[in-house]
Design a protein with these regions (language model features):
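Residue-level marker of regulatory loop/turn positions in helix-turn-helix DNA-binding domains and
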Residues: 1, 63, 101, 125-126
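Short, basic (Lys/Arg/His-rich) helix/loop patches that form interaction surfaces
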Residues: 80-81, 106-148, 155, 167
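Short pre-functional
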Residues: 3-23, 134-138
C-alpha cells in the first residue's frame, strides 16, 4: 500500500494532475521513454469533448522522489499489466481490480500529512496540482508552460500560483 500511495503522491505532483485525472490513468495510457514517462489523459474537467492530452514527466535527479521510478516500482510490485494503475486494497490488504475513487486520494493525502505532523485541514487532492504549479512558478517556468502541463484553459488561476510563488522575490 505504501508503494501505491507514494506513487500517487509523486505522480500527482510531478504531473500537476487533478485527482480525477490521476485515478483515471490506466496501464495502457503509460509510455515509458528515455526522458521519463508520457501519460495519455483521455478526458478532464476542462476537456469535456475528450480531445485528450499527453503529459510528460521527466526523471528527477533524486531517485527517492522521482515519480517515474516510483511508478515503475509500484507497477513491478503490484504486477499490474492492464487496467487501472491506482487500485483499491481489500480489507485483507489484497490488491483488487477496482479503481480508487477521487475521495480516496483526498483521504490518503490527509493520512500522510497527519503522519508527517502537518496540519492537514488546508490540504486536499487538489494540493498536488496547485503545489506543482507553485513550484514550477518558483523555478521560473512561464505561465504557458505551466498551463500546458496542468491543463488550465485560462491564465487567471495560473497567475495566482505565480503571484504566490513570487511574494518573497524582489521584496523591497
Amino acid at each position: 500500500k505504501k508503494f501505491r500511495d507514494k506513487s500517487i503522491i509523486l505522480v500527482g505532483f510531478g504531473g500537476g494532475f487533478r485527482r480525477t485525472e490521476l485515478i483515471s490513468i490506466d496501464y495502457e495510457d503509460l509510455e515509458f521513454v528515455p526522458e521519463g514517462l508520457k501519460i495519455a489523459i483521455k478526458r478532464s474537467k476542462t476537456d469535456q469533448y475528450g480531445e485528450g492530452m499527453i503529459k510528460g514527466i521527466p526523471y528527477f535527479n533524486d531517485k527517492n522522489y522521482c515519480p517515474v521510478l516510483n511508478l515503475k516500482k509500484w507497477l513491478e510490485i503490484s504486477k499490474i499489466k492492464s487496467g487501472p494503475i491506482f487500485r483499491r486494497f481489500s480489507k485483507g490488504l489484497s490488491l483488487t481490480e477496482k479503481r480508487l475513487t477521487d475521495q480516496s486520494v483526498v483521504l490518503l493525502m490527509k493520512e500522510y500529512l497527519n503522519l508527517a505532523g502537518i496540519e492537514n485541514k488546508n490540504f486536499a487532492g487538489h494540493s498536488l496540482r496547485s503545489g506543482f504549479a507553485t513550484v514550477a512558478a518558483e523555478s521560473g517556468a512561464d505561465e504557458r508552460s505551466i498551463m500546458a502541463m496542468t491543463g488550465h484553459k485560462t491564465t487567471q488561476m495560473v497567475r495566482r500560483y505565480i503571484r504566490e510563488a513570487n511574494i518573497f522575490k524582489n521584496n523591497a
